[in-house]
A protein has these predicted regions:
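Short alpha-helical transmembrane segments in multi-pass integral membrane proteins
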Residues: 1-23, 82-147, 183, 191-206
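Residue-level signal for short hydrophobic patches within transmembrane helices
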Residues: 16-35, 63-70, 146
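Interfacial/gating helices of multi-pass transporter permease domains
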Residues: 21, 44-65, 131-136, 196-201
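Generic alpha-helical transmembrane segments of integral inner-membrane proteins
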Residues: 27, 31, 35, 39, ...
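Helix-terminus/linker motif at the lipid-water interface of multi-pass membrane proteins
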Residues: 31, 35-54, 124-131, 187-196
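Small-residue-rich hydrophobic transmembrane alpha-helices
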Residues: 53-114, 151-170
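Short runs within selected transmembrane alpha-helices of multi-pass transporters and secretion channels
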Residues: 75, 143-162, 170-178, 199-205
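Membrane-water interface regions at transmembrane-helix termini and the short interhelical loops
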Residues: 157-165, 185-194
């Protein structure tokens, strides 16, 4: 077994220690994800106003979470297949699975971008979004859908890294992104006065950086 094959072999050595080393970065990642989301809410609520907070955290947020949750599930499914090929050292099928997973993420992201932008307003009205926040919610979702490809590719990439036993690199990326998010939240929303648009542009640029 060469050096590359020894990387991220979580079943080697003392199993419970390896599992804890794999588990804790995921837990901390969830913590930083909550900080990421909370920072947006605090900055918008404190410096923009109730209407903007309702636009970011209301129906628009529910639609965004629904889409992300769906693709996190798909990423987890792809990760199961990839982990099986990785564990079996089946490099041929592993390569095919990786290419298929990323190609699907890109294709689905493009489709969702187009469909989402066209259906944003009807979806908000269907959810009985208050009239005074529909416009800001629509702006938020239009920009959100514009960055959908980056979002899906990141989620797929993070799931694949965890599938091969590497839960640390997704955590490092998330920590860096979280810190940048807080700094740029204040810059875009407070200094530049961009409001809801600034928050969503920041989300999209962070997803691209991921």
């Amino acid at each position: 077994m060469n050096e590359k094959e020894k990387v991220n072999q979580i079943t080697e050595g003392v199993i419970w220690k390896q599992l804890l080393l794999f588990f804790f970065p995921i837990v901390f990642g969830t913590f930083f994800q909550q900080i990421y989301n909370t920072a947006d809410t605090i900055v918008v609520g404190r410096f923009v106003g109730k209407q903007a907070l309702a636009a970011v955290g209301g129906s628009a947020s529910q639609i965004a979470n629904l889409i992300v949750g769906f693709f996190v599930g798909l990423s987890s499914g792809a990760a199961v297949v990839i982990s099986q090929f990785y564990g079996a050292k089946d490099k041929k099928n592993l390569s095919k699975a990786l290419h298929t997973a990323f190609a699907f993420s890109i294709a689905a992201g493009i489709v969702l971008t187009v469909v989402g932008i066209f259906l944003t307003r009807p979806a908000l009205l269907l959810m009985k979004t208050p009239a005074d926040v529909v416009e800001d919610s629509a702006v938020y979702l239009h920009i959100y859908f514009g960055g959908m490809v980056f979002n899906l590719v990141y989620n797929m990439g993070a799931a694949i890294l965890r599938a091969v036993g590497d839960s640390k690199r997704p955590l490092y990326v998330l920590i860096i992104t979280c810190v940048l998010n807080i700094i740029l939240d204040l810059l875009f929303v407070v200094a530049f006065g961009m409001g809801v648009t600034g928050v969503c542009l920041l989300y999209t640029s962070d997803a691209a950086d991921d």
